[in-house]
């Protein structure tokens, strides 16, 4: 059979050598010179015809003179090298993934079996326990330390991530600080008010540093997602509940350039609830500016979203007890805007990976029937001139300019 296979590699015009062994129909027959029998000639002709028919039906092969190696043309449905590159799991970095929306999103992505999640969190042990508590498999996540209230921690996280030599396909800026009842401001390591320093400046530096990594991604859709908030969108009912978000002319934020950090972006008196709302406007303005500056050049999709009101989330843990008691039923039965953490996580996971939500520069929201749509940003959250100024001031504050 070995010689028969070798014959199949030769052009049909080459004749059989006059001396050798020929294996046909699993029976070895010896022939020498001119002593061919009529039976052997007939057997030879029949075998060659069979071999030619097999060659006609099988893929062509390229052979060397000795026919020592055989290279078959790959089947038409075999993955190309470009397709094979995207068969790996996607890698998504999610900030604040130890609880709430971040944890629910990490689980939703991990459950698909198509993603490895980097849980970028301030409390390593809390994140590890949280991942196990929701049943995430160890092979689907990695916990890495990140404290967005420290610009040095942000830089260290980026350095540590790059040491892993993992690709980066999606960055989700989710973590947030909310101190609505605070009477006095708290500050970050660099002296910024805690809400703007964590929610905006920490994420601003992180997104700028990791943009280079996103550019290199060969994943089908590389994305940067910033979680927004309806409370910072003043063209909605919730956005008009006092105190309303208002960045003014950014004089308070810009004062940090002179070492005179203000507790409020607009330079006004401190208000914990407004500080949070202002920071979310900054998030949405940053997303718009990232889209304008980098989408066309890099192919990265930049988007923000409001997944619905997660009224039971730990984000409200510093609100007064009466608020925490009444707010969930109010959202469930009056406004109908309530969503569970699990549902909100699935929505954010959609924005991470769903091809139908791959449009850049969009602020995504959901109807009560869970259908996604492109929401309208308020004038404050879509002001191109203010976004540019915020970008320039923020670059200087985090040391990028």
Curated annotation (Swiss-Prot):
Cell compartments where the protein resides: Plastid, Chloroplast membrane
Keywords: Chlorophyll biosynthesis, Chloroplast, Membrane, NADP, Oxidoreductase, Photosynthesis, Plastid, Transit peptide
Annotated region described as Disordered, given as residue ranges: 65-90
GO cellular component, one term: chloroplast membrane
Functional pathway: Porphyrin-containing compound metabolism; chlorophyll biosynthesis
Entry superkingdom: Eukaryota
Reactions catalysed, as given in the entry: chlorophyllide a + NADP(+) = protochlorophyllide a + NADPH + H(+)
Gene Ontology MF: a single term: protochlorophyllide reductase activity
InterPro entries, alphabetized: NAD(P)-bd_dom_sf, Prochl_reduct, SDR_fam
Biased composition (Basic and acidic residues): 81-90
Inducers of expression: Up-regulated by light. Not under circadian regulation.
Phenotypic consequence of gene deletion: No visible phenotype at the levels of the whole plant or chloroplast ultrastructure; due to the redundancy with PORB. Porb and porc double mutants have a seedling-lethal pale-yellow xantha phenotype at the cotyledon stage, contain only small amounts of Chla, and possess chloroplasts with mostly unstacked thylakoid membranes.
Biased composition (Polar residues): 65-74
Enzyme Commission number(s) from the entry: 1.3.1.33
Tissue-specificity statement: Expressed in flowers, upper leaves, rosette and cauline leaves, stem. Not detectable in non-photosynthetic tissues such as roots and seeds.
Transit peptide, start-end: 1-67
Any one biological process term the GO annotation gives: chlorophyll biosynthetic process
Subunit structure: Part of the FLU-containing chloroplast membrane complex composed of FLU, CRD1, PORB, PORC, CHLP and HEMA1.
Biological role: Phototransformation of protochlorophyllide (Pchlide) to chlorophyllide (Chlide).
Family, per entry: Belongs to the short-chain dehydrogenases/reductases (SDR) family. POR subfamily.
Descriptive protein name: Protochlorophyllide reductase C, chloroplastic
Species annotation: Arabidopsis thaliana (Mouse-ear cress)
